[in-house]
Amino acid sequence: MMPSRFIVVDNDPVNNLLCDLAIRDEVSDAKFLAFTDPLKAFDHISAAGEGNNSMNILLLDINMPIWSGWDFVEHFDKLDEEIKSRFRIYMLSSSIDNNDKQRAMESKNVVDYIEKPLTKEKVFSLL
């Protein structure tokens, strides 16, 4: 299923802009939403309306203030299955820590780990 929306959660607005450009370069009609505050992103996702079956790609930074990407995933794990089934989570990080990569691979709700920067080739691999 082709994703209907790309959501980026990263406290760095410059990275969010770069993600937007890479995504729109590969998927010109992509719906894009960016959050610099992971709590607001989580509120948005957890309030997703019932009956909305659209698929969303969620690109999640690891190192953020207040909530890390791992905190976000921990709370996401507790959401209703109907909501979780609409999201494919990818950790998008500049971290070169192998523990982060391993943790992403072991998480049941994280599809993959992607190193920054997001490029149009990496976007293509998500589709």
What is each stretch, according to the model?
Residues 115-116:
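A Lys-centered signature of the CheY-like receiver
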